[in-house]
Design a protein with these regions (language model features):
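Alpha-helical transmembrane segments and their lipid-water interface positions
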Residues: 3-4, 40, 48, 117
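Cytosolic/stromal cytosol-facing helical appendages immediately following the last transmembrane segment
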Residues: 47-165
């Protein structure tokens, strides 16, 4: 939990700038979410497709048998560290980011992860096109071989890892 704030502290002088435009704020959050989720898709897919990484690292997350919001925290430390690279890549690509954008990014990601691991049928995300809803993620936890995206299910469609089961 301390890794993300420490990372922000390290790069704060490089990327954090004062807030001055709502439009830029919206563009920043959209770009960060897309880049982070693209990274997450490929990292998550690698964790499943590489037998060593799955058996030694990612299987820990899939050992949680009953959906519970805190299950998203149930991961190997290396998976946590590598998972944090996505937003930092986005921050560095953008070059300048508002602190408010980073705060909203964290709120969205944490609430989304709590939601998709809640085991509750449907969610607020079903109203957003291409959003990864609870049922979608539940299929991933049930079958393990598809549905690697998190926020945006279109990655699975684009890269042909979507399945109706």
């Amino acid at each position: 939990c301390l890794l993300f704030p420490l990372g922000i502290l390290v790069i704060s002088d490089l990327v954090i700038v004062p807030y001055n435009s709502f439009l830029i704020f919206l563009l920043q959050i959209a770009v960060i979410l897309i880049i982070d989720d693209f990274y997450f898709y490929w990292f998550h897919r690698l964790l499943h497709k590489n037998k060593f990484l799955y058996e030694k690292i990612h299987i820990i997350h899939h050992k949680a048998s009953n959906p519970f919001p805190a299950d998203y925290l149930y991961e190997h430390p290396l998976e946590w560290i590598m998972g944090l690279l996505g937003p930092f890549i986005a921050f560095l690509i953008l070059g300048e980011v508002y602190f408010e954008t980073i705060a909203l990014y964290l709120i969205i990601r944490v609430l989304h992860e709590l939601d998709i691991h809640s085991g509750i049928k449907s969610s607020m995300y079903k109203y957003f096109p291409f959003a990864g809803v609870n049922e979608y993620h539940a299929l991933h936890h049930k079958y393990h071989s598809n549905h690697f995206s998190s926020l945006f299910s279109f990655w699975d469609i684009i890269f042909k890892t979507h399945s109706k089961y």
